[in-house]
C-alpha cells in the first residue's frame, strides 16, 4: 500500500513544492534570486542598464561601460569603478561612499543628491556633471578631476 501510494504521489512532489504545499510541519522552500552579475563585472558592457535601487555594495565594475545607465538610488558603497565609463549616467540619490572612482568618466552624469563621501577619485572627467545637493565630504571628486 505504501509503495503504491509513493508511486502515485512522487511524480507530483515538484508541483507540490512549487505550489507551496508540503507535509505538515515542513518549512516553506526559500529561494534567493540569483544575481547574474554576482556583484563582479569588470569590463562589462552595461550601457543603458537599469540598476535603480540596486544593492551593489563592493561591486567590481572596473573598466565597465555604464554610459547612460540608470543608477538612481543604487547603493554602490565601496564599489570599484576604476576607469568606468559613466558618461550621461543617472546617479541621482546614489550612495558612492568609499567608492574607488579613479579615472572615471562622469561627463554629463547626474549626481544630484548623491552621497559621494570619502570617495577616491583622481583623474575624473567631470565636464557637464550635475551635482547640486550631492554630499562630497572627504572626496576629491572635483579637485582630482577635469577633462
Feature annotation, model-predicted:
Residues 22-147:
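Tandem repeat scaffolds
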Residues 1-11:
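Bacterial N-terminal signal peptides that target proteins for export
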Residues 1, 18-21:
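Short helix-capping/turn motifs at alpha-helix boundaries
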Residues 11-19:
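Bacterial N-terminal signal peptides
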Amino acid at each position: 500500500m505504501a509503495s503504491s501510494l509513493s508511486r502515485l504521489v512522487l511524480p507530483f512532489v515538484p508541483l507540490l513544492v512549487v505550489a507551496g504545499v508540503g507535509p505538515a510541519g515542513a518549512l516553506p522552500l526559500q529561494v534567493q534570486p540569483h544575481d547574474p552579475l554576482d556583484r563582479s563585472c569588470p569590463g562589462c558592457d552595461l550601457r543603458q542598464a537599469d540598476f535603480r535601487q540596486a544593492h551593489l555594495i563592493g561591486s567590481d565594475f572596473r573598466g565597465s561601460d555604464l554610459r547612460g545607465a540608470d543608477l538612481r538610488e543604487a547603493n554602490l558603497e565601496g564599489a570599484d569603478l576604476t576607469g568606468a565609463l559613466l558618461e550621461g549616467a543617472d546617479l541621482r540619490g546614489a550612495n558612492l561612499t568609499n567608492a574607488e572612482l579613479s579615472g572615471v568618466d562622469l561627463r554629463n552624469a547626474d549626481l544630484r543628491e548623491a552621497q559621494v563621501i570619502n570617495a577616491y577619485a583622481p583623474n575624473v572627467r567631470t565636464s557637464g556633471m550635475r551635482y547640486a545637493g550631492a554630499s562630497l565630504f572627504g572626496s576629491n571628486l572635483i579637485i582630482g578631476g577635469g577633462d
